[in-house]
Amino acid sequence: MTPETVRVEALEGAGDLDAVLAIEAASFAHPTPRAFYERELLRPDVTVLRVLRLPGCAVAGFVSGWRAAGDLEISTLAVHPDWRGRGWGRRLLDDTLAWASREGLQRMLLDVRRSNDAALALYRGAGFVQTGERRRYYSDPVEDAVVLERRLPFSPKIGA
């Protein structure tokens, strides 16, 4: 498998959603329920849900979030545990940054548990800077959130 054979693209259909839910279940103590994603997918003008697709159509990771006032607010970026440590999280992030820039969005925002060193390293390595913190934002366990952002360069859509 080469980087060229891996794609980041919009979620397509129930099979992709099943894969996203499986990644959620493998990654988080409290995964997001199917009904939430089903509702969000009814708002394509606002909701962003992109998948990291390996050859053979296997979904190995995803990113979800919302467009708001020229920003992309990321709620989740996750790679299935079987595929971690291979650079796929960075690929998913880089492709999403490029997509958001082509869409004319100005910033990407997100928050991360203070103890999530791997995620903080990923985002800081991609040019995100800390702009704040949210005290006791997370529960189970209670923990602060680090708020990060990255400004996006304008990159017009091809053919626009």
Features from the language model and the residues they span:
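Acetyl-CoA-dependent GNAT
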Residues: 2-84, 90-99, 103, 151-159
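Well-formed, non-transmembrane alpha-helical positions, independent of function
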Residues: 19, 121-122
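Conserved catalytic-core motifs of GNAT/GCN5-like acyltransferases
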Residues: 35, 109-111, 129-146
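Conserved active-site tyrosine of GNAT-family acetyltransferases
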Residues: 123, 128
